Amino acid sequence: MKIFLDTANIDEIRTGVNWGIVDGVTTNPTLISKEAVNGKKYGDIIREILKIVDGPVSVEVVSTKYEGMVEEARKIHGLGDNAVVKIPMTEDGLRAIKTLSSEHINTNCTLVFNPIQALLAAKAGATYVSPFVGRLDDIGEDGMQIIDMIRTIFNNYIIKTQILVASIRNPIHVLRSAVIGADVVTVPFNVLKSLMKHPKTDEGLAKFLEDWKKVSPDGKLIL
């Protein structure tokens, strides 16, 4: 399973890439607006991210009409070979995905909240579908259940569209996504960091280092 970082913060992206565990990045207008300060422009932020990350970088259109979506998508595609165009799950969005797919432009259908929406996006030719599990949990639904259903549907019909689990709030979302067989999870930086943590890891490391000082008082490894 691939792990994408859901952020437009350059420092977070550099850190994740340096850890060697980030396969791509997803952004949206909200995330980019947080970084568009001190004269930084939208396009400049995206170009910088595309240079840092070798893998896919999702960039969202802001138009809600078919013609505008396609026009913006072509511009986004022109920013770099690894740019993926995020298109909302709407009637115009599906039409835009179909057009862009015919032009071999990778798309990520976003704001998916049920399995049928995911199926429609796949039929239109989306490269990725992004179901929002956290937002479903927020309204009392089991967001992960739709990931399971989408996986089953895509397996049934040998659909190649990748399931990109979004709106992830905690490590359990990541774990369940991996067990179900999602292709990608996109996580905020704080969740990415929490994936590495376990109190027993810290406890074990402290014990090893304490014991090692009995052999090497300064703690150094001498070979």
From Swiss-Prot:
Source domain of life: Archaea
GO molecular function, one term: aldehyde-lyase activity
Reaction equations catalysed: D-sedoheptulose 7-phosphate + D-glyceraldehyde 3-phosphate = D-erythrose 4-phosphate + beta-D-fructose 6-phosphate
GO term, biological process aspect, one: carbohydrate metabolic process
Subcellular location: Cytoplasm
Pathway: Carbohydrate degradation; pentose phosphate pathway; D-glyceraldehyde 3-phosphate and beta-D-fructose 6-phosphate from D-ribose 5-phosphate and D-xylulose 5-phosphate (non-oxidative stage): step 2/3
UniProt xrefs under Gene3D superfamilies: Aldolase class I
Active-site residues, record numbering mapped to chain: 86
Enzyme Commission numbers on file: 2.2.1.2
Record-level GO cellular component terms: cytoplasm
Keywords recorded for this protein, A-Z: Cytoplasm, Pentose shunt, Schiff base, Transferase
Family according to the record: Belongs to the transaldolase family. Type 3B subfamily.
PANTHER family, alphabetized: FRUCTOSE-6-PHOSPHATE ALDOLASE 1-RELATED, TRANSALDOLASE
Function per UniProt: Transaldolase is important for the balance of metabolites in the pentose-phosphate pathway.
HAMAP family to which the protein is assigned, alphabetical: Transaldolase_3b
Name of this protein: Probable transaldolase
Native organism: Thermoplasma acidophilum (strain ATCC 25905 / DSM 1728 / JCM 9062 / NBRC 15155 / AMRC-C165)
